[in-house]
Amino acid sequence: MSNMDIDGINTGTIDKTPEEITSGTSGTTRPIIRPATLAPPSNKRTRNPSPERATTSSEADVGRKTQKKQTPTEIKKSVYNMVVKLGEFYNQMMVKAGLNDDMERNLIQNAHAVERILLAATDDKKTEFQRKKNARDVKEGKEEIDHNKTGGTFYKMVRDDKTIYFSPIRITFLKEEVKTMYKTTMGSDGFSGLNHIMIGHSQMNDVCFQRSKALKRVGLDPSLISTFAGSTLPRRSGATGVAIKGGGTLVAEAIRFIGRAMADRGLLRDIKAKTAYEKILLNLKNKCSAPQQKALVDQVIGSRNPGIADIEDLTLLARSMVVVRPSVASKVVLPISIYAKIPQLGFNVEEYSMVGYEAMALYNMATPVSILRMGDDAKDKSQLFFMSCFGAAYEDLRVLSALTGIEFKPRSALKCKGFHVPAKEQVEGMGAALMSIKLQFWAPMTRSGGNEVGGDGGSGQISCSPVFAVERPIALSKQAVRRMLSMNIEGRDADVKGNLLKMMNDSMAKKTNGNAFIGKKMFQISDKNKTNPVEIPIKQTIPNFFFGRDTAEDYDDLDY
């Protein structure tokens, strides 16, 4: 203990009892100084489910452990309650914005505006950072910005004879008002609702944009795109966000951390930074589905001074995840404008599953409308919307085509841009279209990588990350994977690397034929109880990979 003086008490030598110390003559309560060994142990592995980024208290931890585990029915009821409340919040925000027409409320861009405003209003840490930064800027003579407000671009409907157009309007809200309205509607802090929205935005980004720059920056090949799910998820999405992230996303986070540690050798001496780094690696280890992959992560965890060798190990791990896929959770996330329609759609079951029939039935009932940007094709835009809702950016296009009865195209063949309209494109009288692609069949969603089997693939994107649990061959470009396998495995952990490469080679050799998700079938959308399973037809004329040869704009080039 250091010899610093606390309230007149020298902490170097204490010759009084704690009671004598605390009974001061001034009547004020003084601290009890306890030996360091009596301090409660810190729980390094405490997860933070809160999007406010606050640390979880040990009392809350104990409370969670003693809670009775929810039954599947109870979970479905609480999820139903959450999505209905999100819809109520959307309706309140639209009333406040003065947008009351059904067409305005069905507009995906208006839903996204409300969602972004809510996320900005509830991000206290970012608001505090902006305030401090702005205070410094004002001292340097820059303009003062009111960070107590947040806003977004909404679209108001304009009727011209028989034609309907939309015109952009900028509306601002007080952050505190938005927060209060949200918490009152949800009946709690509503962290699960915020996480749900963040996942929806992440899935939309995965579909609309490529992440070549982000992959190249950490030395990963752009062909590993199928492992990069959830790469735009904010850290405050907590454990829910980690479940959605692909293995490559976590590898990239770890490599970035190692890069910072190499530039600043004191970084990992900071307990907060070290804990954050260890947490990323533990999450990565939990993602891995093969013991050889877990052994490689253990090798990196055991490294005292992370450096180039660890980056090489993690790069190999990311490559192996193309062949032996990690567990990535899949969820159906719809714009909150659709949840607002639940009472009107006759959706009378008070249970809702984000991975099962209810979410898919709700998607089919909805009538979402999107602004069309210059050169957008309405059918192609519908495909983007479908894939965004189902998080199907890296799913096999043949599976999606079988479920919808529509031939899905790769990203490079789609004549449409993302759903966010940049400021320079916002003009008076913008057209819109109904998102028309619907499910003819449904199948439960999966969190498994479908590792039973592999198959042949193409170029560009070289593997799939399954979303729907239906029996099919897993598309994989063996030629591209074999190119990646020709690497140097010498060094401190040659055995671990060698084992992993052997596993990949064995996997490639034996998995030429056969299917993954054996016995899993699809069902007609009217068949809620799975009474008549249907074999999935795989059309060989449709390409496997959405990002085969991609021409999408990069997420990093976005002009928000």
Swiss-Prot record:
Region span, Disordered? 1-73
Q: Name one GO molecular function term.
A: structural molecule activity
Composition bias, Polar residues: 10-29
Which BP terms from GO are recorded? symbiont entry into host cell; viral penetration into host nucleus
- Role: Encapsidates the negative strand viral RNA, protecting it from nucleases. The encapsidated genomic RNA is termed the ribonucleoprotein (RNP) and serves as template for transcription and replication. The RNP needs to be localized in the host nucleus to start an infectious cycle, but is too large to diffuse through the nuclear pore complex. NP comprises at least 2 nuclear localization signals that are responsible for the active RNP import into the nucleus through cellular importin alpha/beta pathway.
Q: Which organism is it from?
A: Influenza B virus (strain B/Panama/45/1990)
Q: What is this protein called?
A: Nucleoprotein
Chain segments annotated as coiled-coil in the UniProt record: none
